[in-house]
Every structure is written in C-alpha cells, then in structure tokens.
Amino acid sequence: MKTRATLALGLISAALLTACGGGGGDAGGPAPVVTASSTNTARYSETLLITLTGSNLDQSLTLSSAGCRNFVRSTTAPFVSSATLAYYTCTTSGVGNLTVTVSGGGVTAATVPFSVSQPQVTLLVNNGAGVSGTLVITLRPQEAPTTVDNFLAYVKSGFYNNTVFHRHGRTATSTPFVMQGGGYAAPVSSTVLFPAPKAASAPIALEVGRGLSNVRYSLAMARTNVLNSATSEIFINTVDNVVLDTSGGGYAVFGSVTTGTTLVDAMVAAPCNLSPLHFNSGFTISTDCVPEPNLMIAGATQTR
C-alpha cells in the first residue's frame, strides 16, 4: 500500500481554559478538601472538564489519570477557579470506565469517575452515480493509539473532505482486495496523471502485532516500503488479507467498518477503469484501477 502527503494537524484546543500544570495555589497551606465532583461527557481525544467543589481548592492540587493527559487549571471565564470551586481540563486518551485522582497536601482528596466510549468516525461517500451512503468506522486506540490519534487529527482538520478513494487494489486474477483513499483531492482520472497528493503531516510510527488483523472491512494505514511512513492515506480491506499483518513489515490496522459494510461492497462493484499510467509506486498498472465516477469522501467527522 502506498501513501504520501503532509498537512499540518489542527488539534482542538480548549478555548477559554488557561493556566498551566496540574495544580495551582499556595503549597504549605491548609489541605484541600473536595466535597463534590463532576465531569462533562467527553469523547475520545477531546476535552474533559472536571469540576471540584470544596474548600482550600486554591492550594496546590495534582490531578492524574491513566485515561486523560495535559491537565490544566482554568482561571478564565466562564470557568474561573476559586478556593471553593475549581475547574480543570485534560484531553481524553483512554476508553472505558476511567478515573481522575485529585491529590493535595500529601493525601488523595478525590477520585473522580468518568467514561469514554470507543471512538467512531463517519465517512460520507458518494460517486454521483448511485453509490452513496455512510461508513461508520469504530476505532481502536487501545491497540493503535498513535495511528488513531493521527487519523482523528486529519478528520478534525477537515483534511479528508472532498478526497477520493483513488485506488481499487486487485490481485493478478482481478480479485478485489483493498479500497485505498484519503490522499488525493477530487477529481482524479485513469487517463491523466494524478495531481500531487494533498500536503499531509509528518509520518507516524508503524503499530503492528497488537492484536488487530487485516480482515474484511478493517481499516488500515497505507504507506510506502518504508515502515514508518504512513501519513493520511487509508485502505479498507475488502476481503480477508491476513498476509498484510506481516508482509513487508505489516500494515497497521486501527479500526473497522461497523456500519455500512453493504456500502463497501457497492464500492467494490462500482465502475473502475484500469490505468495506463503509473500514478504512484503503489499502483499495479495491469490490475489496479481508478473508480470512475470518483468515489468521493464528501465528509468525515468524529461522531462518537
């Protein structure tokens, strides 16, 4: 699988929430006391707001969690922290039932529960000729955290909007095995050299051998022959391709299509033209084809 490109990632920041570190206030004062706590409902890789009620909350507090990172105490409206009401934010980095530990004065002041659902992304696909619908992709950050975070950064920046599935990979016997896209803006043609791929972010480390496999309807990262070269391009396995788990160092699976598998099948059956041109080093000229009309990704959003 071949991929290229580089676009600066636009990670969402928590506007209005400033300050630094996990604590604030004066060390050595009265021990902080937490009498109540709550959180908002946060999705994976988004901002969790933690609200603490009690006394002496302007003293030094330390917040930690196995499922949230980069704790910040808020001092800016509308979340202005005080001695009796404190607000902290962090970016969720785990899924399931999790906790935040609040410590101060050498003791644990509170344990705050929160939960994060398995993240999902919805792709809107349309070729303008009857093949259209939504693909809901459930992501697996437990096994492939770097790959999932990379994919979500592209999704949140709008990078995938109006890109295409440009390559329908087929074997020498013309059996479809992958549908690859996410690197080229529409339109592309089987008779004209592809334009340059969209500029993408820096390549990421390869995450393989972590319990996920290139089975039918799974989603994986395309890359060059260099192991740590994946950027934006993805591919859907349209058949079981377990050989790709180890072939050439393996290809990183990081999710699967959990709603819309019939659409994947329709994409496989959509019109596709062999190309006489060598678009990129991932194209096998004699078997691979370009879906025409283009199978366009009209939108990509994190929906859970």
List each model region and its residues.
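C-terminal motif of bacterial Sec signal peptides marking the signal peptidase cleavage site
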Residues: L16-A19
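Bacterial N-terminal signal peptides that target proteins for export
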Residues: M1-L9
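Cyclophilin-like peptidyl-prolyl cis-trans isomerases
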Residues: G21-R304
